[in-house]
Amino acid sequence: MAKRTKKVGITGKYGVRYGSSLRRQVKKLEIQQHARYDCSFCGKKTVKRGAAGIWTCSCCKKTVAGGAYTVSTAAAATVRSTIRRLREMVEA
């Protein structure tokens, strides 16, 4: 089957509606949310989005809470590093 879109990709379903800049933003989000991610438990690239913020590994069947469009957010990474730093300060 021939490739039908070059620029618009997944947002071709919206046609000419909503404006190009909004469709460009939505394209970025929809590519992220439909992508497969690496599982932090089994290491395979099998994590998919089940609902907003719910990510499930189809291999090991683990369910993880994450961001709405990606498994890990920048805020979550900051919190993890802060918790790790505070834990090291308490132990030392």
Swiss-Prot record:
One of its GO terms (molecular function) is zinc ion binding. Keywords: Cytoplasm, Metal-binding, Phosphoprotein, Ribonucleoprotein, Ribosomal protein, Zinc, Zinc-finger. The modification Phosphoserine is found at residue 40. GO terms for biological process: cytoplasmic translation. It is found in: Cytoplasm. A zinc finger (C4-type) spans 39-60. Disulfide bonds: none annotated. It comes from the Eukaryota. InterPro entries: Ribosomal_eL37/eL43, Ribosomal_eL43, Ribosomal_protein_eL43, Ribosomal_zn-bd. Coiled coil: none annotated. Its main location: cytoplasm. Gene3D superfamilies: 2.20.25.30. One of its GO terms (cellular component) is cytosolic large ribosomal subunit. Signal peptide: none annotated. NCBIfam families: eL43_euk_arch, PRK03976.1. Component of the large ribosomal subunit (LSU). Mature yeast ribosomes consist of a small (40S) and a large (60S) subunit. The 40S small subunit contains 1 molecule of ribosomal RNA (18S rRNA) and 33 different proteins (encoded by 57 genes). The large 60S subunit contains 3 rRNA molecules (25S, 5.8S and 5S rRNA) and 46 different proteins (encoded by 81 genes). Belongs to the eukaryotic ribosomal protein eL43 family. HAMAP family: Ribosomal_eL43. Component of the ribosome, a large ribonucleoprotein complex responsible for the synthesis of proteins in the cell. The small ribosomal subunit (SSU) binds messenger RNAs (mRNAs) and translates the encoded message by selecting cognate aminoacyl-transfer RNA (tRNA) molecules. The large subunit (LSU) contains the ribosomal catalytic site termed the peptidyl transferase center (PTC), which catalyzes the formation of peptide bonds, thereby polymerizing the amino acids delivered by tRNAs into a polypeptide chain. Present with 44600 molecules/cell in log phase SD medium. This is Large ribosomal subunit protein eL43A. It comes from Saccharomyces cerevisiae (strain ATCC 204508 / S288c).
